[in-house]
């Protein structure tokens, strides 16, 4: 982004992108970078939204800036199952569907997708902060 300032001769990115309103981020904790990013857009009310995506699919997005949790994308060619962490490694592990999850319980994410993944344990864990919407 600093290269854009250098090339354009602008002092802020707001001069280059005056209608910039939304920044989607994901994969890393954005908080250490928020202040630097906001300094590039002074006096603009930028909305920041987190997303949960991976090579295996796009799983969730933050719908409201003031809420920490994200909402699962349940109509995106991915079927979600949730394995309680105490079940990991068990040959008869109990796996839950979206209707069977509990709040504040840690789950390992298991996905099946139209891309050919079947009951794939991707290595991520999550907790539900809301049961509706998920």
Indicate residue ranges for each PLM-predicted region.
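Active-site glycine/GP-rich loop and adjacent strand/helix microenvironment
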Residues: 1-134
